[in-house]
């Protein structure tokens, strides 16, 4: 039923100004639309990320958005660190840590948070 439809990720934030600086300035996403002080739409590849103002910002304790970056993961982690992004380190069964990367077999993943504490990640594929 929904297998041929695109999916849009939604992130709750407290301040759209702060979110705009992070998602556009730090992560390099392109802002394509906005609805006043309530919503910003960013483009990432062929998908969209809706960032909206909410009192529940940052309350999700699980990964909210993952970017599949392939072999660029190590370069992307370095570039984001250079922009001040701090990476999270977790103890997880089946994964070993190599610096800021968690590695399991051929998969590499790195987690970080936005200014509201939403958990985001990069994965090698």
Task: Label each PLM-derived region with a short phrase.
Residues 1, 31-32, 40-41, 55-57, ...:
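Short secondary-structure boundary/capping segments
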Residues 1-20, 48, 62-65, 123-125:
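N-terminal beta-strand motif that seeds the catalytic metal site of vicinal oxygen chelate
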Residues 10-49, 54-55:
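Core segments of cupin and vicinal oxygen chelate
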Residues 19-21, 52, 61, 75-77, ...:
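Short acidic, gly/pro-rich beta-turn/loop elements at beta-sheet edges
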Residues 49, 58, 96:
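Flexible, glycine-rich phosphate/dinucleotide-binding loops
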